[in-house]
Amino acid sequence: MGLNCIFNDNLLIMKRLLISLLIIFNVSYAFACTNLIVTKGASTDSSVMVTYAADSHTRYGTLVHYPAARYAPGTMMQVYEWGKDRYLGEIPQATSTYNVVGNMNEHQLIIAESTWGGIEYLTDPNGILDYGSMIYITLQRAKTAREAIEIFTSLADEYGYCSSGESISIADKNEAWILEITGKKPKIVDGINVNKGAVWVAVRIPDGYSSGHANCARITTFPLNDPENCLYSTDVISHARELGLYSGKDEDFSFADTYCPLDFSAMRGCEARVWSFFNRHAEGDWSKYLDFASGENPKNRMPLYVKPKAKISLKEVADMMRDHFEDTPFDMRNDIGAGGHELPYRWRPMSYEVDGYTVTNERAIATQQTGFWFVGQSRSWLPDPIGGIIWFGVDDAGTSPLTPVYTSSEAISWHYSIENGSMIEYSETSMFWLCNRIAQFAYLRYNQIGKEVRGVIDELERRRIKEIANSDSTALAIYKNGELKNHKECVKY
């Protein structure tokens, strides 16, 4: 009896019920994501890399595609909240847009995010734009990271921002930034919010350094007069003063401490993931931040960015997205919850009480509820149609392979299509469902089956890295000869 036996009608009915319950009872876990950032000078091949895991109990993993297009002046675009399909309103469409594959566009711009929520009342329920819509609208309109920051924040100010606090990774082929943003407190006059928009700060990650964020604001103090390296909204400090959130000097203002105060969950469930990345790849002894990552000492914050002890490769940053805190004090293979097969997963809840004691389950980078994940790679030494690659995967990163897709591609594989299956509709040709089946099988005996699955993934990805190098060479030769049609065929890899 094969794996198909677990996908009978009864289990599909159970899945529908479970998904409904998750929507109702697990809203706080709905969008828990991880981003890792590697600058040109910190990578082995001088590419800029951004990773993203879209973690949600209800997100179906697909690769979206927005073809480049031209629109007549005055055309309006309808906006639907990302992941919920709730109609929010409409805004003017740009007269021309860029090709977008996943979270990258044809100019090698990458945008990703992680949600941290922040102060509950700093949300505009009447805003037309949510963070997800803003990401994909910006990707269709911006060429560079700096232009993306300008467009992203201007959209919020002009049309209203209906999401809560977010950390946004924005990178191009030369620079990488973290933008942190939260809404303003609404002020309703005659039924209209006259205080729409957002407060925000963006910091450039210095070349040669790496960074990350995982559902917790990380920008503390920032330079007030250094636009090469830091940009911010004019009212980011004054709005905090108006709300009684801050009363100190401007130069001492900390965005994260003001708009996203730390608590145990933020440190242990969120910052610990960033600590794991730094612990593995950064210079120095990271045990000095264990009390912070453990949720015990909020005063011992980690730096926003770090210098790696050795340059980081594409494969290494991809494998970091498969991290379960192995060989650290948070290693989940070593406690009773791992069972007899060293399972590095804890299903839920993240904490619970037993005999008056609170027990905490770790939240690693790799998790069972990932919808999709990727490593975006921007390569400045190649022309844009060839340089941008999104290495894309679906379901749990620990048991799913990455597929390279050039961001100039004009079509998406049916196996990753949003039209192929859904979270409650099984499709045997859907990559999400295939990877989900493999993951469920691996969870049964993780130290045996999971190890074998990982070996297959490693071999496959190493082969694809070599194939892409050959494909790049072929595409570049065709591109230099001006044979655009053949070049487009080449990047269908």
Task: Name each model-derived stretch.
Residues 17-26:
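Sec-dependent N-terminal signal peptides
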Residues 8-17:
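Positively charged n-region of N-terminal signal peptides that target proteins for export
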Residues 454-493:
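Histidine-centered catalytic/metal-binding microenvironments
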Residues 28-32:
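Sec/Tat signal peptide C-region and signal peptidase I cleavage site
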Residues 241-389:
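Glycine-rich, aromatic-lined ligand/substrate-binding cores of catalytic
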Residues 33-131, 151-311:
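A contiguous strand-loop segment
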Residues 340-469:
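Substrate-recognition/cap regions that form aromatic- and gly/pro-loop-enriched pockets
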